[in-house]
Amino acid sequence: MDKPKRKASFTQRVYEVVKTVPPGAITTYGDVAAALGNPRLARQVGWALSALPSDTDVPWQRVINSKGAISFRGECGRAEEQRRLLGSEGVEFNEHGRCELEVHRWWYPDLREALDAD
């Protein structure tokens, strides 16, 4: 007898959505939450990403805040690492620590149907 498919957890769905962001593009915590169907869960997206192991294949660095800035503060060099990784993908930050969202922002295709099928 086949087991019924379990719906992916919120955290797993966050990871699946973030994996769709191509190199050189960025998204926001709110954009990820909106792609999952609830833009009010931006903070939970951040928590999910902060739980990733260091050897992950999820491109966490491509998720920034809605002001175009990196949100990590005082986390053992994570902000510097994120900025370095994004820089290697062609994402530049200005003197205020912000990137141009209108240039680099990834607009999701409608992912809800595909994610709900899992």
Can you say where each PLM-predicted feature lies in the sequence?
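Nucleic acid-binding interface residues in structured DNA/RNA-binding domains
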Residues: M1-D118
